[in-house]
């Protein structure tokens, strides 16, 4: 990223940080016998044993997936600036602060409702970062009209990180890892992020 900045292909100090997470399925064949997943990300019931002891199960869009979660921060243009990998059952709400290391004071942090917590908002305040986290409705406490409008506005900015995930999954075929183990999957994620950033820079040059 430093070299892209020096070449004028990426802004040096972005005014926005966009945070989200995506699932990277474990390497190998699909497992189809999963029925229930407990709070620890383990399957309740009989399944084919996994070769990847670091991977965990998660239910996403009605489907059970075994793998990892890539927690990611991009700038406003979709360049990946920071990421880290956890088992898939890790909740993104607890993994916001590591993604914000090194960003400048006054930066607006955009994130979806999965990051809505008092702790995360306090972290932004303590580090003089602007709050762009979408609000989550609670039981017996629906969102106000103003909060709903704010969420709609914030979602228009968050699309850049979703576009980056789409490119990783389609262009770089990274919906599934090529290796077993958290360390190797983390290394692969960082290499894919470098490829994504170089592709975005190349597209900018040819535009």
Map each language-model feature to its residues.
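Polybasic low-complexity intrinsically disordered regions
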Residues: 1-127, 195
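Residue-level "edge-of-site" marker
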Residues: 17, 137, 182
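Short, acidic/turn-prone active-site loops that include or flank metal/cofactor-
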Residues: 85-87, 135-139
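Short, charged, surface-exposed secondary-structure boundary motifs
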Residues: 94, 119, 139-147
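Short secondary-structure boundary segments
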Residues: 112-113, 135-136, 163
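Feature captures the catalytic cores and cofactor-binding loops of soluble hydro-lyases/lyases
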Residues: 124, 142, 162
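Basic, amphipathic alpha-helical segments enriched in Lys/Arg and hydrophobic/aromatic residues
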Residues: 127-128, 147-207
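Short hydrophobic/aromatic-enriched beta-strand-loop microsegments
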Residues: 127-135
